[in-house]
Amino acid sequence: MSDIKKAVLAYSGGLDTSVILKWLQDTYGCEIVTFTADFGQGEELEPARAKALQFGIKPENIFIDDLCEEFVRDFVFPMFRANTIYEGEYLLGTSIARPLIAKRQIEIARLTGADSVSHGATGKGNDQVRFELGYYALEPGIKVIVPWREWDLLSREKLMAYAEKHGIPVEMRHKQGGSPYSMDANLLHISYEGRHLENPNAEAEESMWRWTVSPEKAPDAPEIIEIEFKSGDPVAINGKAYKPHELLAELNRIGGMHGIGRLDLVENRFVGMKSRGCYETPGGTILLKAHRGIESITLDREVAHLKDDLMPRYASLIYNGLWWAPERLALQTLIDHTQQAVNGIVRLKLYKGSVSVISRDSANTLFDQNIATFDDDGGAYNQADAGGFIKLNALRMRIAETARRKRAKK
């Protein structure tokens, strides 16, 4: 790809992408456009601009974009309409951010006339797949530069040596009292990988967790909150309306105080290996419980069961980077259709790491107390009808057992 003219780099300003920026300049001699995304990760992003300028990047080629609203509204909330969990536990906080990064990189490439894009994901992880599937889905002819699959800087020590040689200003945060882990944060979650976590038999240190208090140290009194839903999406907490990204941030704050949303997981990566990561997803954990609570009274039984059947497939599509694939879009259409009547209010109890639904109410409820009651229902439900229903459902089993007995007599 020696004919590269201009590349859009997903740039954080950290060690890896700073080295990549310099390497791209030296290896390809191309013009670089940097893109830094604000996903509500809680970090100051302007230093990324200053670093890019130090590399000689033109001011008009430096993009620092606030994507918080779009991220939660168009990616997180649609995913939560499906009650999405990967391998029974993971709420896909990293996975769901990647398609938006890819989308914005392609938009910037079109805006600036760039012919290529680049990212800092390694050749061992899922993110390389997620980014590149997104690139090609949105811009089939785009060129993709992946330094980790080309260079020989395959260790942290080699990266640091390269940075020192080229005068790249990179802070080693763990030597300055920061975290020694590889972290990824956005409004949905924060993840931790690397160091002693690479041993699945080693317990995560309490000092690692940043968003949540230890459940043992959470308040001794439970907190009751209400979440209102409209068409499957949360719109208010305790009667106060929020924009999507503000609502998730508020749930993170509340959940973090009660030690909600910690996860220590060994997962199966798309590229074939198992990996261990720790995650904090306080707001998402609350939201998932609340959404299932409101669906329990507003969804038809077979529709709810169909959603549950499809959810693992939908989760795998997102985890594997197939957000833009036609099958994910088709599933989303079905999922969104099921949410039309998912309106109402759910009350939840938060206490020392746990979330419990304690009540749910909706104008669209399918729960009929007159039918469900243990008391006299006034003829709303004829219990005698159950006999025929049971016999018909038992018919195939009765036939099978009768046939078995005939065979046994021979």
Swiss-Prot record:
L-aspartate binds at T122, N126, D127. ATP binds at A10, Y11, S12, G13, G14, L15, D16, T17, S18, A37, G120. InterPro entries: Arginosuc_syn_C, Arginosuc_syn_N, Arginosuc_synth, Arginosuc_synth_CS, Arginosuc_synth_type_1_subfam, AS_cat/multimer_dom_body, Rossmann-like_a/b/a_fold. L-citrulline binds at Y90, S95, N126, R130, S182, S191, E267, Y279. Its main location: cytoplasm. One of its GO terms (cellular component) is cytoplasm. Pathway: Amino-acid biosynthesis; L-arginine biosynthesis; L-arginine from L-ornithine and carbamoyl phosphate: step 2/3. Keywords: Amino-acid biosynthesis, Arginine biosynthesis, ATP-binding, Cytoplasm, Ligase, Nucleotide-binding. It is an enzyme of class 6 (ligase). It catalyses: L-citrulline + L-aspartate + ATP = 2-(N(omega)-L-arginino)succinate + AMP + diphosphate + H(+). Its EC number is 6.3.4.5. It is found in: Cytoplasm. It comes from the Bacteria. One of its GO terms (biological process) is urea cycle. Homotetramer. This is Argininosuccinate synthase. It comes from Polynucleobacter necessarius subsp. necessarius (strain STIR1). The gene is argG.
